[in-house]
Amino acid sequence: MKSEFAFVALPISALVAPSAFAVQYLTVDQAQKAIFPGKTFSPAPVKLTSAQRKAIEQASGVRVLRDDQQVSRVTGGGWFIVDEVVGKHEFITYAVGLNADGSVKQIEIMDYRETYGGQIRDQKWRAQFVGKTSKSTLKLDSDIKNISGATLSCRHITDGVKRLLAFYEIALKH
């Protein structure tokens, strides 16, 4: 009696590929309601000029990766901005609510795609940004405490908020 074996080959990449880790914590609508409960929003997307881009980079010390910024004007004053930064390897999507005076009202982590470092979602860590303005230094390990095991995520969110505060001064403040 003859046995037949079917050989199924798995691609080598399937055997050695790292496991993907991505969690969507909040949609845009949910983040808007968390930061500005009861308010309404008017989309006000911004496309930066090269001069604005350079000015933001100079003011913040952080590179601007995109010319288009997803922004909404909040009824009664304020701004809601969705942004992305790279954690260690993957993008972190977050939202920043700015008061009418350009100070940080609140930040929310919307999508986190890294395997480690999700502790940046901790409310106590995010609260360190409340009240910060473009005049604030926003330095990790100085006025923003680092989280062990989440250093790159902490650094890049801090840099992203710093860049968005400069963005407010240069592109949104009227």
Regions found by a protein language model. Name each.
Residues 21-147, 151-155, 159-174:
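Flexible, solvent-exposed loop/hinge segments and secondary-structure transition points
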